[in-house]
Amino acid sequence: MTELGSLFLIVFALYIVQCVCWVNPDSVVFALGLRDRGKKKSRGLTLSGLDTAAFLANPLPPLSPLLVTHWPAFQLNPDSVLISGPNGEATSITWETLVVTRSGSRLLFNGTSVFKGDETQVLGYCQLLQQLRQATRPQRERAIEKWLREGLDSKASARRLQVFQRRSLWIRIVSNLQFFFLFFLLPFAIGIYPRMLRPAIILVVATSVILAIEFWSVHRKLYKKTADTRFTATFTIALSPLAAIRTCDTLCRNLVAGYHPVAVAAAICTDAAFEAIAGEQLRYAKFTSASDWYQKKLVGLIEQVIRQRGLEPRRLLTPSSQMSGCILYCPRCLTQYVTNREECSDCGHKALVAFTSSGTGTSFSP
């Protein structure tokens, strides 16, 4: 292999690393490509020791970013906050004894990490929780209900995505051109037509600067409270052609981070994809040990979004069919079993349900 070929492979390998999206393992990741728009990405490579998962964005033109949404596992109610302990047990913390702190991308309750995500999202939750601590019980109840309604507002998430699509048009065009300049024009100039090398380098650098300027403008519109993050990202894009190619990734990744996955799915998914995601999220909310108050409010709002898409929520709570020989199923993940058992081997849910209508799976016993 020639030196030019080796250099090309090294640069392309670095570019592939740039295409990796690092998220919390509990995040839901959507693709925004022309062919797979709204498709939920299958589970990425999970690094359990680092509490991180890796998802690969489409590296080749037409470039498309990934959309990440991460709903917090902590559950708020007017009297307390419910979190999961190290062994999955529920722990309740009263508002009077709750101490909320943050460390970078982590949110902590009384020193225990309860959420890891986008720094802007963590800051927003920290401010919300501080306000709730100082509120009276009626005020707290109204504020939590408002927060849940906003998180399940599919129209608001759709509007935010539309703003991104409209404002990022030039970024999407120029970043695809930058891919061509860096991986086709520049190697051609180096290996075949050296007289083009200086103009090619100038073109790559100028394109990175243009993308950085446009990124600053769009980011300021979409993320008004993240000046430090905006400066760092703009500086990186201006100096690194590889980062410049993935400018849309930086803009889009946390665009709807504060919205529930069902609200985002309702805004971008096909009917079939939405049904799968909505059913998964509805079952998780309904059959996960939780504060009764929080569970009732969250499930009610999820069901409302499902009905707005013309689906009946109850139909998403049972398997579409009963597999041959199966007598039980898990109401949370719909895994079916041929023998009696006490808990689901896939998700750990303990209250398995017996089929009561042979071959249909449409009826269940609570």
Feature annotation, model-predicted:
Residues S64, S154-L182:
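Loop-to-transmembrane boundary segments
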Residues V23-D79, G88:
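Membrane-interface amphipathic/juxtamembrane segments adjacent to transmembrane helices
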Residues Q127-A158:
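Short, charged cytosolic
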Residues P59-Y125, L129, R230-P366:
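Charged, low-complexity cytosol-facing tails and large interhelical loops of integral membrane proteins
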Residues L67, R195, P199-L211, H219, ...:
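Composition-driven recognition of long, C-terminal low-complexity regions enriched in serine/threonine
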Residues M1-F12, I173-F179, F184-I210:
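Hydrophobic alpha-helical transmembrane segments
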Residues G33-K41, P72, L76, I83, ...:
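Intrinsically disordered, low-complexity segments enriched in charged and polar residues
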Residues V17-R43, I210-I237:
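Transmembrane-cytosolic junction motif
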